[in-house]
Amino acid sequence: MREMITIKPGKITVQANPNMPEEVANLFRKQHYEIVGRHSGVKLCHWLKKSLTEGRFCYKQKFYGIHSHRCLQMTPVLAWCTHNCIFCWRPMETFLGTELPQPWDDPEFIVEESIKAQRKLLIGYKGNPKVDKKKFEEAWEPKHAAISLSGEPMLYPYMGDLVEEFHKRGFTTFIVTNGTVPERLEEMIKEDKLPTQLYVSITAPDIETYNSVNIPMIPDGWERIMRFLELMRDLPTRTVVRLTLVKGENMHSPEKYAKLILKARPMFVEAKAYMFVGYSRNRLTINNMPSHQDIREFAEALVKHLPGYHIEDEYEPSRVVLIMRDDVDPQGTGVNGRFIKH
């Protein structure tokens, strides 16, 4: 077990705080999450289930070659975040802020227990006549960890070790972060423990939109994100800036988004629609959900301000458009290619 941290303006300090209250854990369980240890969680992805029962797949399979049925969707920080984003589909009204759990579970424990939790959630599909036996057996042995799901995963202070534990087991890894913990990325760079693909979710083109859409719980969130984007530039791993676009809220100023993207110069940019699902329905309306055509038009406007980038692909079921840097090999794998090297 490890000590805890609490994020503070400009630095991270140690501070005592109780573990996740049982009423919060029970709310997650009702939403079909498996609680892992003191502060982590696992949930079967919508597209994993669709892949097993219908042969459909997530846009990440089309864009990057990640097999949806072999993806483990987890988070080491289930109920803690630095933002209160209006579009979040998680039950963030019960989130516990930025005062984090004590003590921390070890990375090895989290990885092993997350795999067990995934299998517990999968077992009901074993006898399903719609599920191919071979595909189920592959799903039983996940090979890709999507470290996102809920909360802000980079608040976990041993993220580099967590990534390393997954890699030891032959996993590829994605981390999806809101970019407010740049010191964690600095540590991972120094330790040479980067994920296979690092996402930062940028959901505002300027600080005014950031304050109204992301509703930060820390006073220097925007400055932290700017630092994170600078750190991403030229990282020796795959990098993505994801724009979650909410009609009537943050779907404006493509030229300002472009300036932020060029700070990081990622391999990929994903322009993706907000989806009217989960708890976000308590805060927004279906009119806030862009159509795929809306996303396509925004991506076309955005790429005009992104020299060295082009629209590479799109996936209408997920309402997402992939923008790619011109020097990325469209048929290649690894850190210089479009596809993940397994």
Swiss-Prot record:
Q: Name one GO biological process term.
A: tRNA processing
Annotated [4Fe-4S] cluster 2 binding sites: C81, C85, C88
Sample GO molecular function, one term: tRNA-4-demethylwyosine synthase activity
Q: Which UniProt keywords apply?
A: 4Fe-4S, Cytoplasm, Iron, Iron-sulfur, Lyase, Metal-binding, S-adenosyl-L-methionine, tRNA processing
Q: Cite the EC number.
A: 4.1.3.44
User: Which residues take part in binding [4Fe-4S] cluster 1?
Assistant: C45, C58, C71
The compartments listed are: Cytoplasm
Among Pfam families, the record links this protein to: Radical_SAM, Wyosine_form
Q: Which InterPro entries match?
A: Aldolase_TIM (IPR013785), rSAM (IPR007197), tRNA_wybutosine-synth (IPR013917), tRNA_wybutosine-synthase (IPR034556), TYW1_archaea (IPR023993)
Q: How does it assemble?
A: Monomer.
Q: Which NCBIfam families match?
A: rSAM_TYW1
Job description of the protein: Component of the wyosine derivatives biosynthesis pathway that catalyzes the condensation of N-methylguanine with 2 carbon atoms from pyruvate to form the tricyclic 4-demethylwyosine (imG-14) on guanosine-37 of tRNA(Phe).
What protein is this chain from? S-adenosyl-L-methionine-dependent tRNA 4-demethylwyosine synthase
Per the UniProt record, the source organism is: Pyrococcus abyssi (strain GE5 / Orsay)
- What phylogenetic lineage does the species belong to? Archaea, Methanobacteriati, Methanobacteriota, Thermococci, Thermococcales
The protein's gene is named taw1
